[in-house]
């Protein structure tokens, strides 16, 4: 279990008011911040901290997300009607730019098939 602490009393002045994460399962302490003597993210055995007093501090641990292959999201802030009108009347929308596969492209430069595909993928009823 991980516990966050702020050291309030220690024989070593470098530890005073420093913040640490204590891992009770491994018997290790990870330095979050210290005035001197310890580097950020330095890991030491809890016994190396010596005789200390501390107060617990809240720690929020977020689960680590690992995705094989990655994910990608393109956001276009448009109405379906705007894109459909751009297909019918491209001269009215010479500057209409959308995101496709991570890059910006003028909607009118896409082929009709690509335009239909963008409209179909962008506007769905549900996920």
Swiss-Prot record:
The record's annotation in NCBIfam families points to: spare_glycyl
Q: Would I find Acetylation among this entry's keywords?
A: yes
Taxonomically, the superkingdom here is: Bacteria
**What PROSITE patterns would the database entry show?**
GLY_RADICAL_1, GLY_RADICAL_2
Q: Which organism is it from?
A: Escherichia coli (strain K12)
User: Where in this protein does the record say N6-acetyllysine is found?
Assistant: 48, 88, 92
Q: What do we know about what induces or represses this protein's expression? A: By acid stress.
**Which keywords label this protein?**
Acetylation, Organic radical, Stress response
Q: Provide the phenotype resulting from gene inactivation.
A: Cells undergo an apoptotic-like death upon DNA damage characterized by membrane depolarization; further disruption of recA prevents membrane depolarization.
Record's protein name: Autonomous glycyl radical cofactor
Single GO biological process annotation from the record: response to stress
Q: What does this protein do?
A: Acts as a radical domain for damaged PFL and possibly other radical proteins.
What's the name of its gene?
Answer: grcA
Q: Name one GO cellular component term.
A: cytoplasm
The record's section on Gene3D superfamilies has: 3.20.70.20
Q: Which residues form the Glycine radical domain?
A: 5-127
Q: Which residues carry this modification: Glycine radical?
A: 102
The GO terms this record gives for MF are: formate C-acetyltransferase activity
Question: Sorted alphabetically, which SUPFAM superfamilies does this protein's record hold?
Answer: PFL-like glycyl radical enzymes
Report whether Acetylation shows up as a keyword of the record.
Answer: yes
Q: Which is a Pfam family this sequence falls into?
A: Gly_radical
